[in-house]
Amino acid sequence: MVTGWHRPTWIEIDRAAIRENIKNEQNKLPENVDLWAVVKANAYGHGIIEVARTAKEAGAKGFCVAILDEALALREAGFQDDFILVLGATRKEDANLAAKNHISLTVFREDWLEELTLEAPLRIHLKVDSGMGRLGIRTTDEARRIETTIAKDNQLQLEGIYTHFATADQLETSYFEQQLAKFQTILTSLKNRPTYVHTANSAASLLQPQIGFDAIRFGISMYGLTPSTEIKTSLPFELKPALALYTEMVHVKELAPGDSVSYGATYTATEREWVATLPIGYADGLIRHYSGFHVLVDGELAPIIGRVCMDQTIIKLPREFQTGSKVTIIGTDHGNTITADDAAHYLDTINYEVTCLLNERIPRKYIH
């Protein structure tokens, strides 16, 4: 995707916020527990390479990604000796590529290990489905069989075992406790404990520090976003959001009563009013459902009117502004703030989706 460096729409990523979130989390971890930075999905929309650099500077001991390509991108960017774990499924035919690049892979099927021809040692993390229902082995028998298969091949190493909690971001903990108990049953069934046992995502690491095991996978909260609104007031420290989204007015005009804007003419002025066109649209991740939401102009709320277009969006202004005036879509302006949580609430989704939708057509600028 082409990045729009010659368009006045941009994202600012505050590296100091990322560092502070990591440091605050590390301060509450036992000394022997590593923090791995989860940088999948372009670092949740924040930019994988720059975020990885920032996280490493702050003390992260490794990285988690979703797909092998993300791991390879980190290696190509200079992270040659860092621990990298692919959390998602990897094709069997790509095992050698991972092995040659010293990338750890998730395994959750016995048949995946059959007839592997490896040219370099491959490090495996066994995924346990303790109740998430996506990927993972579910019984002690499966775990022992896979452990035996790995032990027979001197090119395979069972480096880790892990699970993922479905309800760690909820205050009610009964299902979380069921998952933890199931995982521990499978863990204790192994003859040899792997080097890395890890279960905690952001929510679990914040609310359940006792289950840190050997490492935590610090994702959404590294970016200063709460795993869920339900636990926002129960967090052990204040999270600092790292992402802000800005644009500028490229056209300002006055509408007369009866004038309509955008596709479908869904918005019609009932009085004389000022509107501005913004150079951002659903092709950038500002999806059509943002229509009716608001932005900040000089610290004042300005509603998005009409339908969001592919490349442009129209807002109603509180008064006349000059072309080129700055507009805050996510972030703070003159003491007022629009958060990713605010957008998520309006869109009936979660803050993860809000930032992940912001694609690479919008340039990222890194500050602090």
Swiss-Prot record:
CDD domains: PLPDE_III_AR. It catalyses: L-alanine = D-alanine. The active site is at residues 40, 263. Substrate binds at residues 134, 310. Keywords: Isomerase, Pyridoxal phosphate. GO terms for biological process: D-alanine biosynthetic process; peptidoglycan biosynthetic process. The keyword Isomerase applies. SMART domains: Ala_racemase_C. Catalyzes the interconversion of L-alanine and D-alanine. May also act on other amino acids. HAMAP family: Ala_racemase. Belongs to the alanine racemase family. This is Alanine racemase. The lineage of its organism: Bacteria, Bacillati, Bacillota, Bacilli, Bacillales. The gene is alr.
